[in-house]
């Protein structure tokens, strides 16, 4: 649901005086609720109470039985959408395959730009989003727009930064409460482009996107997957959260990782973050497998690619992401040590080494 839809729904809805309902009214409300559930086709798949799967923990002296924990049992917080969360993310998994860039647009479409130019642009955009304190979703959405546009439209080097500015403008209008003004974006680009040029490029991008600005990003999935990863902790584990976000943001710079869908990058980022924090423990479990819908073997190639990126960095003078997560407010996670390799047994599926 778009922000506009959410706002219009909230504006047009009046609160009910529940205290005034008599027994007859209660029956009417109950029947309406059943009717609404039927119309919405709310899935029963989210009910995981009592569902369990066996999982062998490597790196431990004893075999541990791991149960799936229901992360959608908090009905107190309306923002968690506990009743609909499972179906929402099921829909997003389908949607992410439809709003993806080409995986080889640099080789097949573009003639004047290469992967390093793309990385430099995104590194600069990381600095801009930090400078203007934009939400992370704006950055991810900006990169999504850039890559999708480059997948079809040929662009020259001079207009590469212009494309980035225009996509940032669109994404910030979609995500931010107070998006930066066009004049501000012209200023941060050292006035390389005029206001009219930015607006013209914005129109070109919107036309190409057919004004469909909603797109599932890695950040979208990361939020829910982190909830599943921290289900055994009363308070959020900030080191895990920041480290997973750092790894995910590094992936934005790496062109070779475009071949992986956002949900897979999000799941692999959590896998790698948990491994870095506790190298002797199996980072995956049945709760993560259930809510991400990925087995350890599914994560293997993506997690290894992210691990290489974590070890060597994006290269060149691309320091924005590393410097960002080297700050105290992010618990210095960019400075964390990681073992040089991930044990192969961590990528084995439960059935491959322990029968049901």
Swiss-Prot record:
**Gene giving rise to this polypeptide:** CYCA1-4
Any coiled-coil regions, as ranges: none
The lineage, from the top, is: Eukaryota, Viridiplantae, Streptophyta, Embryophyta, Tracheophyta
Fetch the InterPro entries from UniProt: Cyclin (IPR039361), Cyclin-like_dom (IPR013763), Cyclin-like_sf (IPR036915), Cyclin_C-dom (IPR004367), Cyclin_N (IPR006671), Cyclins_cyclin-box (IPR048258)
The record's annotation in SUPFAM superfamilies points to: Cyclin-like
Its family? Answer: Belongs to the cyclin family. Cyclin AB subfamily.
Keyword vocabulary terms for this entry: Cell cycle, Cell division, Cyclin
Q: Name one GO cellular component term.
A: nucleus
Instruction: Provide the protein name.
Output: Cyclin-A1-4
Q: Name one GO molecular function term.
A: cyclin-dependent protein serine/threonine kinase regulator activity
Q: Which Gene3D superfamilies match?
A: Cyclin-like (1.10.472.10)
Among PROSITE patterns, the record links this protein to:
CYCLINS
GO process terms (BP): cell division; G1/S transition of mitotic cell cycle
Cell cycle keyword on record: yes
**Keyword Cell cycle attributed:** yes
Task: Please tell me the species this chain comes from.
Answer: Oryza sativa subsp. japonica
């Amino acid at each position: 649901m778009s922000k506009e839809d959410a706002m219009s729904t909230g504006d047009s809805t009046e609160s009910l005086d529940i205290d005034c309902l008599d027994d007859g009214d209660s029956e009417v409300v109950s029947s309406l609720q059943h009717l609404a559930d039927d119309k919405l086709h709310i899935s029963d798949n989210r009910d995981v109470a009592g569902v369990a799967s066996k999982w062998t923990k490597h790196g431990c002296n004893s075999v541990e039985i791991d149960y799936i924990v229901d992360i959608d049992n908090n009905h107190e917080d309306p923002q968690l959408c506990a009743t609909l969360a499972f179906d929402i993310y099921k829909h997003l998994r389908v949607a992410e395959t439809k709003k993806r860039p080409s995986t080889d647009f640099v080789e097949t479409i573009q003639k004047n730009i290469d992967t390093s130019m793309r990385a430099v642009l995104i590194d600069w955009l990381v600095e801009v989003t930090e400078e203007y304190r934009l939400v992370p979703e704006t950055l991810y959405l900006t990169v999504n727009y850039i890559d999708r546009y480059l997948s079809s439209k040929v662009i020259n080097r001079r207009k590469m930064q212009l494309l980035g500015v225009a996509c940032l403008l669109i994404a910030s209008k979609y995500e931010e409460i107070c998006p930066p003004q066009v004049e501000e974006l012209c200023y941060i680009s050292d006035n390389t482009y005029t206001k009219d040029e930015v607006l013209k490029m914005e129109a070109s991008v919107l036309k190409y996107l057919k004004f469909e600005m909603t797109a599932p990003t890695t950040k979208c999935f990361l939020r829910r997957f982190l909830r599943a990863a921290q289900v055994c902790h009363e308070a959020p584990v900030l080191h895990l959260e920041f480290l997973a976000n750092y790894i995910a943001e590094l992936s934005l710079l790496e062109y070779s990782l475009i071949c992986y869908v956002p949900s897979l990058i999000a799941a692999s980022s959590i896998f790698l973050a948990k491994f870095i924090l506790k190298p002797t423990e199996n980072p995956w479990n049945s709760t993560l497998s259930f809510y991400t819908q990925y087995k350890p073997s599914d994560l293997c190639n993506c997690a290894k690619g992210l691990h290489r990126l974590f070890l060597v960095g994006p290269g060149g003078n691309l320091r924005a992401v590393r410097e960002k997560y080297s700050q105290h407010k992010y618990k210095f996670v960019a400075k964390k040590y990681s073992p040089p390799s991930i044990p192969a047994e961590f990528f084995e599926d439960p059935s491959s080494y322990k029968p049901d």
